[in-house]
A protein has these predicted regions:
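N-terminal carbohydrate-binding accessory modules
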Residues: 5-59, 321-324
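Solvent-exposed loop/turn segments at secondary-structure junctions
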Residues: 23-28, 57, 63-68, 103-106, ...
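Surface-exposed, active-site-proximal loop segments in enzymatic domains
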Residues: 28-35, 64-81, 105-121, 226-231, ...
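Extracellular glycoside hydrolase catalytic/binding regions
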Residues: 35, 39-40, 124-145, 149-290, ...
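An active-site-proximal structural segment forming one wall of the substrate-binding cleft
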Residues: 38-57, 72-103, 107-145, 161-173
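Well-ordered alpha-helical segments within folded domains of soluble proteins
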Residues: 59-62, 98, 260-261
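His/Asp/Glu-enriched short active-site or ligand-binding loop at hydrolase and phosphoryl-transfer sites
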Residues: 291-295
């Protein structure tokens, strides 16, 4: 069941669901690619496990090139139908979906990478895509938010992520004034560097007053989430996650804004990371900030942080921590 939301101080909400990324729509390096060869989308079967665990929010990564084959062109009806089927399936289970354009402020057309905000790929083409998506999904009651862009980073000096986000916000609000809009931070959405890299996002204007800010937080020494080294070499401590996410949480509270951790994760094999994770999720829960684990989905195998849900009933150790934190307080 979906909890009733109660406003808290600092812009945070109680009853906000925690959840998981079901990543597979962003897979592959061929664009738009062939469905079920280069990429796929999760289905109702991928929701069963997470519903049973009470983790009721799903972040759904997708690639712009697959839902719209050419800038300013129509939406791809085949992919759109598959995404709608997934959103409907989630809704029947009382689960919410956060869209995630997993494009890093870029898209690849005919093998050539283009950056939004350059002459090759205008801000307006990006806004037009989001206007059409909002037109298609504004009637769904279980859209947690339109996630404008995954991990903006390394843009040329002539390009502004702030402007890009504002164009998308303005475009969406021409057709949908109710659904939240989720804005990722600059520099890979880093929670630890949020104030240095993303402070200007607080000046974004939303006529609906319904923005949520998204940060990512991995606990290894460089924040990449690769966890290549030992706990000690990665500078692990029980409170490391709390220390890394605190700049973002304090920024939210200071500016009376809402937030979410769109990605976090730990490796298995060293129980000390589990204590770090427990402290991290406890801190977020108490501060009204939900979080989404990276990652699960139908094509994942045993990568460093992933949680495949098909391994003969054997659960990964992260689960016993995650299922303690189902919603914010």
């Amino acid at each position: 069941m979906i909890s009733v939301l109660i406003t808290l101080s600092g812009g945070m909400l109680a009853g906000e669901p925690f959840g998981v990324n079901l990543a597979c729509g962003d897979f592959g390096s061929v664009f738009p690619g062939e469905y079920n060869r280069h990429y796929t989308y999760p289905t109702d079967a991928d929701l069963v496990y997470w519903q049973q665990k009470g983790l009721m929010l799903v972040r759904l990564p997708f690639r712009w090139e697959r839902l719209q084959h050419k800038p300013y062109g129509p939406l791809c009806q085949d992919d759109l139908a598959k995404v709608k089927d997934f959103v409907k399936a989630a809704g029947k289970r009382g689960m919410k979906v956060l869209f995630d354009m997993h494009n890093y402020c870029r898209r690849i057309d005919e093998g050539t990478e283009k950056i939004v905000g350059t002459p090759e790929l205008s801000y307006e083409s990006y806004g037009q895509f989001w206007r059409m998506m909002a037109q298609e999904f504004r009637g769904f009651g279980n859209i947690y938010g339109y996630g404008l862009m995954n991990e903006p980073h390394d843009l040329p000096a002539s390009v502004s992520w702030h402007k890009m986000a504002q164009v998308a916000i303005d475009s969406i609000r021409t057709v949908d004034t109710k659904t939240p809009i989720v804005v990722g931070g600059y520099h890979w959405s880093s929670a630890r560097r949020w104030v240095q890299m993303s402070d200007n996002l607080k000046t974004l204007r939303d006529p609906a007053g319904n923005l949520i800010f998204e940060a990512h937080c991995y606990f290894d020494f460089d924040g990449s989430g690769t966890y290549k080294f030992t706990y000690e070499q990665e500078e692990g401590t029980p409170k490391r996650g709390v220390e890394l996410v605190r700049p973002f949480v304090e920024w939210l509270n200071k500016n009376n804004l809402r937030g979410i951790i769109g990605e976090y994760g730990i490796p298995e094999g060293d129980e000390r990371w589990e204590k770090t994770l427990d402290n991290f999720l406890s801190y977020l829960q108490k501060n009204g900030v939900p979080a989404l684990y990276w990652a699960s989905g139908p094509w994942w195998t045993d990568a460093v942080m992933t949680i495949p849900t098909y391994r003969g009933g054997k659960e990964k150790p992260q689960i016993k921590i995650m299922e303690k934190y189902k919603e914010t307080k």
